[in-house]
Swiss-Prot record:
PANTHER family: 2-ISOPROPYLMALATE SYNTHASE 1, CHLOROPLASTIC-RELATED, HOMOCITRATE SYNTHASE-RELATED. SUPFAM superfamilies: Aldolase (SSF51569), post-HMGL domain-like (SSF89000). It comes from Thermus thermophilus (strain ATCC 27634 / DSM 579 / HB8). This is 4-hydroxy-2-oxovalerate aldolase. It is an enzyme of class 4 (lyase). Divalent metal cation. Has the highest activity with Co(2+) as cofactor, followed by Ni(2+) and Mn(2+). Mg(2+) and Ca(2+) are very poor metal cofactors.
Length: 347
Protein backbone atom coordinates (compact mmCIF):
# COMPACT_ATOMS: atom_id res chain seq x y z
CA UNK A 1 0.00 0.00 0.00
CA UNK A 2 1.39 3.42 -0.92
CA UNK A 3 0.79 6.66 0.88
CA UNK A 4 0.64 10.11 -0.63
CA UNK A 5 3.38 12.15 0.99
CA UNK A 6 2.80 15.19 -1.22
CA UNK A 7 1.11 17.11 1.60
CA UNK A 8 3.44 15.84 4.35
CA UNK A 9 5.93 18.21 5.90
CA UNK A 10 9.36 17.63 7.46
CA UNK A 11 8.68 16.33 10.97
CA UNK A 12 10.19 17.17 14.31
CA UNK A 13 12.35 14.14 15.12
CA UNK A 14 12.84 12.96 18.69
CA UNK A 15 15.42 10.28 19.48
CA UNK A 16 14.65 7.89 22.31
CA UNK A 17 17.71 5.61 22.20
CA UNK A 18 18.50 6.57 25.80
CA UNK A 19 14.95 5.83 26.98
CA UNK A 20 13.17 3.21 24.83
CA UNK A 21 16.59 1.77 24.06
CA UNK A 22 17.06 1.32 27.79
CA UNK A 23 14.67 -1.64 27.61
CA UNK A 24 16.90 -3.44 25.13
CA UNK A 25 19.94 -2.39 27.17
CA UNK A 26 18.32 -3.78 30.33
CA UNK A 27 18.62 -0.29 31.85
CA UNK A 28 22.42 -0.66 32.01
CA UNK A 29 23.57 2.54 30.27
CA UNK A 30 26.70 4.18 31.65
CA UNK A 31 27.42 7.90 31.72
CA UNK A 32 30.11 7.40 29.08
CA UNK A 33 27.68 5.63 26.75
CA UNK A 34 25.05 8.33 27.26
CA UNK A 35 27.54 11.09 26.48
CA UNK A 36 28.76 9.38 23.30
CA UNK A 37 25.24 8.74 22.02
CA UNK A 38 24.04 12.24 22.90
CA UNK A 39 26.99 13.93 21.21
CA UNK A 40 26.44 11.97 18.00
CA UNK A 41 22.71 12.73 17.98
CA UNK A 42 23.25 16.40 18.74
CA UNK A 43 25.76 16.79 15.93
CA UNK A 44 23.38 15.03 13.53
CA UNK A 45 20.58 17.51 14.17
CA UNK A 46 17.83 15.75 16.15
CA UNK A 47 15.36 18.07 17.86
CA UNK A 48 15.32 16.31 21.22
CA UNK A 49 16.93 13.39 23.06
CA UNK A 50 14.82 11.46 25.55
CA UNK A 51 16.68 10.13 28.59
CA UNK A 52 15.28 8.09 31.47
CA UNK A 53 14.63 4.58 32.68
CA UNK A 54 12.77 2.66 29.99
CA UNK A 55 9.57 2.90 32.02
CA UNK A 56 10.09 6.57 32.70
CA UNK A 57 11.24 8.63 35.64
CA UNK A 58 11.25 6.59 38.83
CA UNK A 59 11.06 3.32 36.91
CA UNK A 60 14.15 1.72 38.44
CA UNK A 61 12.59 -1.01 40.58
CA UNK A 62 12.21 -4.75 41.06
CA UNK A 63 9.11 -4.81 38.84
CA UNK A 64 10.54 -2.85 35.90
CA UNK A 65 14.25 -3.53 36.28
CA UNK A 66 16.95 -1.70 38.22
CA UNK A 67 19.08 0.94 36.49
CA UNK A 68 22.84 0.58 36.53
CA UNK A 69 23.24 4.36 36.58
CA UNK A 70 20.87 6.78 38.28
CA UNK A 71 18.75 8.36 35.56
CA UNK A 72 19.42 11.82 36.94
CA UNK A 73 23.14 11.28 36.33
CA UNK A 74 22.39 10.29 32.75
CA UNK A 75 20.15 13.33 32.23
CA UNK A 76 22.80 15.62 33.69
CA UNK A 77 25.50 14.09 31.48
CA UNK A 78 23.41 14.47 28.33
CA UNK A 79 22.48 18.07 29.14
CA UNK A 80 26.16 18.90 29.68
CA UNK A 81 27.03 17.27 26.35
CA UNK A 82 24.49 18.67 23.90
CA UNK A 83 24.72 22.07 22.26
CA UNK A 84 21.49 22.21 20.24
CA UNK A 85 19.18 19.33 21.07
CA UNK A 86 16.60 19.57 23.83
CA UNK A 87 16.70 17.02 26.63
CA UNK A 88 13.48 15.16 27.41
CA UNK A 89 12.29 12.50 29.84
CA UNK A 90 9.33 10.13 29.97
CA UNK A 91 6.93 10.09 32.90
CA UNK A 92 4.19 7.54 33.56
CA UNK A 93 1.64 8.66 36.17
CA UNK A 94 1.77 6.12 38.97
CA UNK A 95 5.49 5.46 38.45
CA UNK A 96 6.97 8.96 38.26
CA UNK A 97 5.90 11.64 40.74
CA UNK A 98 6.39 15.37 41.26
CA UNK A 99 9.58 14.53 43.15
CA UNK A 100 11.19 12.77 40.17
CA UNK A 101 9.97 15.41 37.73
CA UNK A 102 11.42 18.21 39.85
CA UNK A 103 14.74 16.36 40.12
CA UNK A 104 14.77 15.84 36.35
CA UNK A 105 14.20 19.55 35.76
CA UNK A 106 17.07 20.35 38.10
CA UNK A 107 19.20 17.81 36.19
CA UNK A 108 18.43 19.59 32.93
CA UNK A 109 15.33 18.35 31.09
CA UNK A 110 13.43 20.88 29.00
CA UNK A 111 10.62 18.57 27.90
CA UNK A 112 8.55 15.85 29.55
CA UNK A 113 6.56 13.22 27.73
CA UNK A 114 3.62 12.08 29.86
CA UNK A 115 2.40 8.59 28.98
CA UNK A 116 -0.90 6.94 29.90
CA UNK A 117 -2.81 3.98 28.60
CA UNK A 118 -4.89 5.16 25.65
CA UNK A 119 -8.04 4.83 27.78
CA UNK A 120 -6.72 6.82 30.75
CA UNK A 121 -5.80 10.31 29.55
CA UNK A 122 -7.81 11.74 32.45
CA UNK A 123 -5.17 10.64 34.98
CA UNK A 124 -2.60 12.96 33.39
CA UNK A 125 -4.23 16.30 34.23
CA UNK A 126 -2.12 17.12 37.29
CA UNK A 127 1.05 15.95 35.56
CA UNK A 128 0.54 18.32 32.64
CA UNK A 129 -0.17 21.02 35.21
CA UNK A 130 3.14 20.30 36.92
CA UNK A 131 4.97 20.30 33.60
CA UNK A 132 3.63 23.72 32.66
CA UNK A 133 4.27 25.03 36.16
CA UNK A 134 7.91 23.99 35.74
CA UNK A 135 8.21 25.64 32.33
CA UNK A 136 8.54 22.42 30.33
CA UNK A 137 7.47 21.56 26.82
CA UNK A 138 4.74 18.98 27.49
CA UNK A 139 4.00 15.99 25.28
CA UNK A 140 1.24 13.41 25.74
CA UNK A 141 1.60 9.71 24.91
CA UNK A 142 -1.47 7.52 24.29
CA UNK A 143 0.09 4.10 24.80
CA UNK A 144 -1.24 0.88 23.23
CA UNK A 145 -3.18 2.97 20.71
CA UNK A 146 -3.94 -0.09 18.57
CA UNK A 147 -6.46 -1.19 21.21
CA UNK A 148 -9.01 1.55 20.55
CA UNK A 149 -10.58 3.06 17.40
CA UNK A 150 -9.52 6.45 15.99
CA UNK A 151 -12.55 8.37 17.25
CA UNK A 152 -12.00 7.17 20.82
CA UNK A 153 -8.34 8.16 20.70
CA UNK A 154 -9.32 11.59 19.39
CA UNK A 155 -11.43 12.16 22.51
CA UNK A 156 -8.55 11.12 24.75
CA UNK A 157 -6.19 13.41 22.84
CA UNK A 158 -8.58 16.32 23.33
CA UNK A 159 -8.38 15.76 27.07
CA UNK A 160 -4.58 15.97 26.98
CA UNK A 161 -4.73 19.08 24.82
CA UNK A 162 -7.08 20.64 27.35
CA UNK A 163 -4.66 19.84 30.15
CA UNK A 164 -1.90 21.72 28.32
CA UNK A 165 -0.20 19.20 26.02
CA UNK A 166 1.79 20.83 23.23
CA UNK A 167 1.88 17.54 21.31
CA UNK A 168 -0.14 14.33 21.58
CA UNK A 169 1.25 11.06 20.25
CA UNK A 170 -0.33 7.96 18.84
CA UNK A 171 1.91 5.30 20.39
CA UNK A 172 2.06 1.82 18.86
CA UNK A 173 3.47 0.27 22.03
CA UNK A 174 2.84 -3.27 20.81
CA UNK A 175 4.06 -2.73 17.27
CA UNK A 176 0.68 -4.14 16.27
CA UNK A 177 -0.50 -1.55 13.76
CA UNK A 178 -0.67 -1.84 10.00
CA UNK A 179 -0.04 1.34 7.97
CA UNK A 180 -3.76 2.01 7.57
CA UNK A 181 -4.14 1.83 11.37
CA UNK A 182 -1.42 4.42 11.89
CA UNK A 183 -2.87 6.64 9.17
CA UNK A 184 -6.43 6.55 10.53
CA UNK A 185 -5.41 7.28 14.11
CA UNK A 186 -3.11 10.17 13.27
CA UNK A 187 -5.70 11.60 10.88
CA UNK A 188 -8.35 11.48 13.62
CA UNK A 189 -6.11 13.44 15.99
CA UNK A 190 -5.21 16.00 13.33
CA UNK A 191 -8.90 16.66 12.76
CA UNK A 192 -9.78 16.73 16.47
CA UNK A 193 -7.06 18.94 17.95
CA UNK A 194 -7.19 22.70 17.60
CA UNK A 195 -3.80 23.65 19.03
CA UNK A 196 -1.63 20.65 19.88
CA UNK A 197 0.60 18.99 17.32
CA UNK A 198 0.33 15.26 16.60
CA UNK A 199 3.12 12.70 16.94
CA UNK A 200 3.68 9.03 16.14
CA UNK A 201 5.85 6.48 17.97
CA UNK A 202 6.46 3.15 16.22
CA UNK A 203 7.67 -0.30 17.21
CA UNK A 204 8.98 -2.79 14.69
CA UNK A 205 7.44 -6.05 15.88
CA UNK A 206 5.75 -6.65 12.52
CA UNK A 207 8.59 -5.04 10.56
CA UNK A 208 6.49 -1.93 9.89
CA UNK A 209 8.11 0.81 11.99
CA UNK A 210 9.31 2.84 8.99
CA UNK A 211 6.20 2.08 6.93
CA UNK A 212 3.88 3.08 9.74
CA UNK A 213 5.88 6.25 10.35
CA UNK A 214 5.49 7.19 6.68
CA UNK A 215 1.76 6.48 6.88
CA UNK A 216 1.57 8.74 9.94
CA UNK A 217 3.38 11.50 8.05
CA UNK A 218 0.98 11.11 5.13
CA UNK A 219 -1.86 11.62 7.61
CA UNK A 220 -0.26 14.84 8.84
CA UNK A 221 1.94 13.81 11.79
CA UNK A 222 4.10 16.69 13.00
CA UNK A 223 6.47 14.76 15.28
CA UNK A 224 7.98 11.26 14.98
CA UNK A 225 10.25 9.12 17.15
CA UNK A 226 13.19 6.90 16.30
CA UNK A 227 16.27 5.27 17.84
CA UNK A 228 19.76 4.52 16.59
CA UNK A 229 19.80 1.00 15.12
CA UNK A 230 16.13 0.78 16.13
CA UNK A 231 17.37 -0.01 19.66
CA UNK A 232 14.25 -0.35 21.79
CA UNK A 233 11.66 -2.63 23.35
CA UNK A 234 10.41 -5.66 21.46
CA UNK A 235 11.80 -5.67 17.93
CA UNK A 236 12.83 -2.07 18.50
CA UNK A 237 11.70 1.24 17.06
CA UNK A 238 12.05 2.98 13.72
CA UNK A 239 15.84 3.05 13.11
CA UNK A 240 16.83 6.72 13.12
CA UNK A 241 19.54 6.37 10.49
CA UNK A 242 17.11 4.60 8.13
CA UNK A 243 14.34 7.10 8.82
CA UNK A 244 16.71 9.98 8.07
CA UNK A 245 17.66 8.45 4.72
CA UNK A 246 14.00 7.80 3.84
CA UNK A 247 12.95 11.32 4.81
CA UNK A 248 15.77 12.75 2.73
CA UNK A 249 14.74 10.71 -0.32
CA UNK A 250 11.14 11.83 0.18
CA UNK A 251 12.10 15.51 0.38
CA UNK A 252 11.06 15.64 4.03
CA UNK A 253 14.43 15.91 5.79
CA UNK A 254 14.04 18.35 8.72
CA UNK A 255 17.79 18.98 8.85
CA UNK A 256 19.20 15.62 9.86
CA UNK A 257 22.69 14.72 8.68
CA UNK A 258 22.11 11.30 7.14
CA UNK A 259 25.77 10.31 6.97
CA UNK A 260 26.55 11.39 10.52
CA UNK A 261 23.64 9.22 11.66
CA UNK A 262 24.89 6.28 9.61
CA UNK A 263 28.28 6.67 11.27
CA UNK A 264 26.66 7.03 14.71
CA UNK A 265 24.66 3.85 14.18
CA UNK A 266 27.71 1.91 13.04
CA UNK A 267 30.56 3.24 15.15
CA UNK A 268 28.92 4.68 18.28
CA UNK A 269 25.88 2.48 18.77
CA UNK A 270 27.23 -0.73 17.26
CA UNK A 271 29.80 -1.46 19.98
CA UNK A 272 27.29 -0.54 22.72
CA UNK A 273 24.41 -2.81 21.69
CA UNK A 274 23.59 -5.75 23.93
CA UNK A 275 21.85 -7.27 20.89
CA UNK A 276 20.29 -6.05 17.65
CA UNK A 277 16.49 -5.98 17.99
CA UNK A 278 14.66 -7.43 15.00
CA UNK A 279 11.33 -9.17 14.34
CA UNK A 280 12.24 -12.61 15.67
CA UNK A 281 9.78 -15.34 16.63
CA UNK A 282 8.78 -13.83 19.97
CA UNK A 283 8.81 -10.19 18.82
CA UNK A 284 6.48 -10.98 15.93
CA UNK A 285 4.21 -12.73 18.43
CA UNK A 286 4.05 -9.49 20.42
CA UNK A 287 2.93 -7.51 17.38
CA UNK A 288 0.55 -10.26 16.28
CA UNK A 289 -1.05 -10.59 19.73
CA UNK A 290 -0.92 -6.88 20.57
CA UNK A 291 1.25 -7.19 23.68
CA UNK A 292 3.23 -4.34 25.26
CA UNK A 293 6.71 -4.48 23.70
CA UNK A 294 8.60 -4.22 26.98
CA UNK A 295 7.19 -7.61 28.03
CA UNK A 296 9.51 -9.38 25.56
CA UNK A 297 12.69 -9.75 27.60
CA UNK A 298 10.75 -10.40 30.81
CA UNK A 299 8.85 -13.23 29.08
CA UNK A 300 12.06 -14.68 27.64
CA UNK A 301 13.76 -14.64 31.06
CA UNK A 302 10.81 -16.08 32.99
CA UNK A 303 10.15 -18.65 30.28
CA UNK A 304 13.74 -19.84 30.45
CA UNK A 305 13.67 -20.03 34.26
CA UNK A 306 10.41 -22.02 34.34
CA UNK A 307 10.83 -24.04 31.18
CA UNK A 308 7.81 -22.42 29.51
CA UNK A 309 7.77 -21.31 25.87
CA UNK A 310 7.88 -17.45 25.79
CA UNK A 311 5.66 -17.56 22.71
CA UNK A 312 2.89 -19.22 24.72
CA UNK A 313 3.29 -16.66 27.50
CA UNK A 314 3.07 -13.72 25.09
CA UNK A 315 0.07 -15.07 23.21
CA UNK A 316 -1.81 -15.62 26.47
CA UNK A 317 -0.93 -12.10 27.66
CA UNK A 318 -2.33 -10.80 24.38
CA UNK A 319 -5.53 -12.77 24.88
CA UNK A 320 -5.89 -11.19 28.33
CA UNK A 321 -5.11 -7.71 26.90
CA UNK A 322 -2.29 -7.04 29.36
CA UNK A 323 -0.94 -3.48 29.32
CA UNK A 324 1.96 -1.50 30.78
CA UNK A 325 2.16 -1.79 34.54
CA UNK A 326 0.98 -5.39 34.51
CA UNK A 327 4.42 -6.95 34.26
CA UNK A 328 3.52 -9.15 37.24
CA UNK A 329 1.06 -10.93 34.95
CA UNK A 330 3.99 -12.42 33.03
CA UNK A 331 5.07 -14.60 35.95
CA UNK A 332 1.48 -15.46 36.81
CA UNK A 333 0.70 -16.56 33.26
CA UNK A 334 3.93 -18.55 33.03
CA UNK A 335 3.15 -20.39 36.28
CA UNK A 336 -0.39 -21.14 35.10
CA UNK A 337 0.89 -22.50 31.79
CA UNK A 338 3.49 -24.64 33.58
CA UNK A 339 0.83 -25.99 35.95
CA UNK A 340 -1.48 -26.72 33.02
CA UNK A 341 1.30 -28.52 31.19
CA UNK A 342 2.14 -30.57 34.28
CA UNK A 343 -1.52 -31.50 34.67
CA UNK A 344 -1.74 -32.60 31.06
CA UNK A 345 1.33 -34.82 31.50
CA UNK A 346 -0.14 -36.34 34.67
CA UNK A 347 -3.32 -37.22 32.80
Amino acid sequence: MSWDLSTAKPPVVVDTTLRDGSHAHRHQYTVEEARAIAQALDEAGVYAIEVSHGDGLGGSSLQYGFSRTDEMELIRAVRETVRRAKVAALLLPGIGTRKELKEAVEAGIQMVRIATQCTEADISEQHFGMAKEMGLEAVGFLMMSHMRPPEFLAEQARLMEGYGADVVYIVDSAGAMLPEDAYARVKALKEALSRAKVGFHAHNNLGLAIGNTLAALAAGADWVDATLRGYGAGAGNAPLEVLAAVLDKAGLNPGLDVFKLLDAAEYVMGPILHFQPYPDRDSVAIGYAGVYSTFLLHAKRIGKELGVDPLAILLELGRRQAVAGQEDWILRVALELKEKEAGALAD
